[in-house]
C-alpha cells in the first residue's frame, strides 16, 4: 500500500491540518503529490456557480493554512476551492478526476454531553455516543462506500 497521490479535504479544523501534514509526509516519501480541497456546499436554491463571497474567503484562508502546513515539512500542495451540491460527492469525484491513490479524512474528537447538563434530545433524536464512540456522519459514510481508492481516517486524541 503506497500512497503517492493523495487527496485531503479540509475544513479548517486542527484534525484536517494534521491530515495535510500526514499526506505531505507520505507523499514526500513516495515522490507523490497532495491535492487539498475545500468544498463549499451550494444550496439547490442557488446556481452552482453562485458567488458565495464570505464562504469563498473562508475557504481560501483554510487552503492558505494548508499550504503553510505543507511548507513546514518542505512540501508543496495543490489547493483548490470547489463548489458543489454535496460535499461527499465532490470528494469522490475529485478523487476519480485526479486518479489519487488515497484520501485522508480527518475527524475531530467530540466529547459527548455530560449527564445532568439539562440537555434533552428532540423527539426522535439520538443520545450522545458513549465514551469512545462517535458517528462519522454522511460525508464520511459516502466517501468510505464510494471512493475508488484507499481511505484513511485520522482522529486527534481526546483533549481533557
Task: Set out the residue ranges of the language-model regions.
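Small/aliphatic-rich secondary-structure junction motif
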Residues: 1-53, 69-78
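Alpha-helix N-cap and loop-to-helix initiation/capping positions
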Residues: 11, 50-58, 128-135
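Charged docking surfaces used in two-component/phosphorelay signaling
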Residues: 82-90
Amino acid at each position: 500500500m503506497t500512497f503517492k497521490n493523495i487527496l485531503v479535504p479540509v475544513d479548517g479544523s486542527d484534525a484536517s491540518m494534521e491530515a495535510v501534514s500526514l499526506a505531505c509526509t507520505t507523499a514526500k516519501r513516495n515522490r507523490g503529490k497532495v491535492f487539498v480541497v475545500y468544498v463549499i456546499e451550494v444550496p439547490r436554491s442557488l446556481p452552482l456557480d453562485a458567488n458565495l463571497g464570505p464562504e469563498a474567503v473562508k475557504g481560501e484562508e483554510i487552503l492558505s493554512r494548508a499550504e503553510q502546513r505543507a511548507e513546514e515539512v518542505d512540501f508543496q500542495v495543490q489547493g483548490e476551492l470547489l463548489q458543489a451540491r454535496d460535499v461527499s460527492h465532490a470528494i469522490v469525484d475529485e478523487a476519480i478526476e485526479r486518479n489519487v491513490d488515497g484520501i485522508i479524512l480527518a475527524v475531530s474528537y467530540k466529547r459527548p454531553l455530560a449527564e445532568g447538563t439539562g440537555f434533552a434530545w428532540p423527539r426522535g433524536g439520538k443520545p450522545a455516543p458513549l465514551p469512545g464512540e462517535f458517528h462519522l456522519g454522511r460525508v464520511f459514510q459516502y466517501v468510505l462506500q464510494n471512493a475508488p481508492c484507499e481511505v484513511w481516517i485520522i482522529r486527534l486524541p481526546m483533549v481533557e
